């Protein structure tokens, strides 16, 4: 190639660099003509910037692939040996990543966007009480995994078919090329949320709060979309990471027909569930501490509600800061400790068979990956759907 044989190494970085520049261009295309724009108009403006960035990255990728790669190169396919791959097939793998990223944005918007069928269903179910609200929200989060996981499966399979493990890596690189745009869209949510809080606390004109509510409802969707991209990139790179793991440990593969490996697969599947439970429990404990502190201040400091006394803000900040650090200690230790424990126990039980221990750890990682992706999609979309269902009532 034109780079002394390192073109395939430089290509992902070149696409990422082009993606940053293109994302900056995309932000200038996010424009709203009316000061009284509704949710659909705001979402459309953000989509214009996002979709333009994705299309331009696709065009840039085509040029970079043809410039930086040789006409043909050899790629290894697991169990099939080396095969000749054309530069065009690498571009097809890159295109897979972009298309899947765009599709994930669309599906996430559908499941979490204000006025969409899933949100309207949650609103309707809420008319009969909290129980049916919870059922509808859980069902929305669960059904949203269907489209996302199918997209991940298609992306992994097709990108591998086009260019082997390199194709999978290129698909992930292309998907993350618009990270700058995705982060901007993701950050839009909390910025709009905090702006609404400031508007309410500073007694701004009611129309200001109405407009920030519109931005906030769109922000709930964009935040879910940004997290969806992060989940997708993790899922898409799983095959490449397992290939690197197999190469590094010098094992033939991860055979789940072996009892210890299958056992660790189930253990890995359990960890994201327990992690989620611990994280939710931590939030509950921190919230209880905060509520008790606020109640104490209302009781002991007269005049807070009338605005003539100053609350002790530092106490609330101290509670949230300490709780966020202290309560996440156990979930963090769980994720770090289990892999170490598996290796230690494996070496003690099979001191002469280190390859089996490596397979056990690989089985654990496979379980974590599959379970973690499903739980991440479910919680991300269910949370966004509930949040915008709440906005529907407030509106």
Question: Where are the language model's segments positioned?
Answer:
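Hydrophobic packing and interface segments
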Residues: 1-395
């Amino acid at each position: 190639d034109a780079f002394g044989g390192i073109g395939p190494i430089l290509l992902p970085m070149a696409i990422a660099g082009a993606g940053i520049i293109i994302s900056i261009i995309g932000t200038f295309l996010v424009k709203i003509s009316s000061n009284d724009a509704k949710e659909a108009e705001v979402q459309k403006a953000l989509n214009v910037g996002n979709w333009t960035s994705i299309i331009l990255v696709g065009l840039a990728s085509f040029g970079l692939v043809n410039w930086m790669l040789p006409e043909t190169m050899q790629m290894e396919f697991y169990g099939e040996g080396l095969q000749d791959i054309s530069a065009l097939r690498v571009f097809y793998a890159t295109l897979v990543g972009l298309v899947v990223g765009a599709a994930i944005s669309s599906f996430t918007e559908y499941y979490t966007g204000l006025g969409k069928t899933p949100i309207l269903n949650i609103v309707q179910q809420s008319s009969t009480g909290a129980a049916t609200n919870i059922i509808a929200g859980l069902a929305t989060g669960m059904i949203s995994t269907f489209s996302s996981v199918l997209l991940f499966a298609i992306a992994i399979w097709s990108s591998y078919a086009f260019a082997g493990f390199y194709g999978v890596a290129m698909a992930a690189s292309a998907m993350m090329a618009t990270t700058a745009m995705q982060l901007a869209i993701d950050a839009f949510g909390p910025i709009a949320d905090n702006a609404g809080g400031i508007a309410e606390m500073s007694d701004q004109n009611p129309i200001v709060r109405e407009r920030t509510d519109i931005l906030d409802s769109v922000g709930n969707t964009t935040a879910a979309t940004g997290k969806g991209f992060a989940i997708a990139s993790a899922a898409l790179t799983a095959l490449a990471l397992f290939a690197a793991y197999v190469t590094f440990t010098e094992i033939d593969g991860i055979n789940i027909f072996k009892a210890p490996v299958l056992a660790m697969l189930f253990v890995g599947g359990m960890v994201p569930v327990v992690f989620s439970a611990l994280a939710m429990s931590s939030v509950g404990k921190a919230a209880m501490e905060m509520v008790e502190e606020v109640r104490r201040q209302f009781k002991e400091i007269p005049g807070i509600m009338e605005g003539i006394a100053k609350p002790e803000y530092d106490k609330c900040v101290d509670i949230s800061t300490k709780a966020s650090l202290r309560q996440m200690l156990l979930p963090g230790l769980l994720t770090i400790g289990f892999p170490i424990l598996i290796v230690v126990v494996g070496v003690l039980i099979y001191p002469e068979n280190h390859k089996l221990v490596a397979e056990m750890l690989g089985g654990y990682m496979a379980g974590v990956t599959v379970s973690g992706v499903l739980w991440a999609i479910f919680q991300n979309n269910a949370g966004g759907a509930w949040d915008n269902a709440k906005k529907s009532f407030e509106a």
